[in-house]
Amino acid sequence: MFRGANAINLDAKGRLAMPSRYRDELDSRSAGQMIVTIDAVDPCLCLYPLSEWELIEAKLRDLATFREENRRLQRLLIGNAVDLELDGSGRFLVPPRLREYARLDKRVMLVGQLNKFQLWDEDAWNALADADLAAIQKPGAMPDELRDLIL
């Protein structure tokens, strides 16, 4: 499982170095093969080990294609999906089109989301994290099922 938020640098060629603490798990789960695609809700990218992406792809394939919203989601996620592989130095190349979508420049946040990562522009991530914290702290803002999760 992938956890934590990691500030990493995007180099001039559009490569990111995967933090070493995740590399063994990525190697064992998918031989370092990953898929990156857009997040259909937030202005970030989703980075999946290939084995996880194949599960999502199967669910997308099973959606009823006569519904426009299903086709739209399939086009967005599958149409923007790109195969990636860690190189010998643990780096991977983020395609220019996807970097533009997420507005990734020099400083990037790699955020573990259990079965995947999100890639955020650092400033966008910090603003969202602050807004999320403020929203969840408002009285009555948290649904009962989430209140039960808090330790």
From Swiss-Prot:
One of its GO terms (molecular function) is DNA-binding transcription factor activity. Belongs to the MraZ family. CDD domains: MraZ_C, MraZ_N. Residues 5-52, 81-124 form the SpoVT-AbrB domain. GO terms for cellular component: cytoplasm; nucleoid. Forms oligomers. SUPFAM superfamilies: AbrB/MazE/MraZ-like. Keywords: Cytoplasm, DNA-binding, Repeat, Transcription, Transcription regulation. This is Transcriptional regulator MraZ. Its main location: cytoplasm. One of its GO terms (biological process) is negative regulation of DNA-templated transcription initiation.
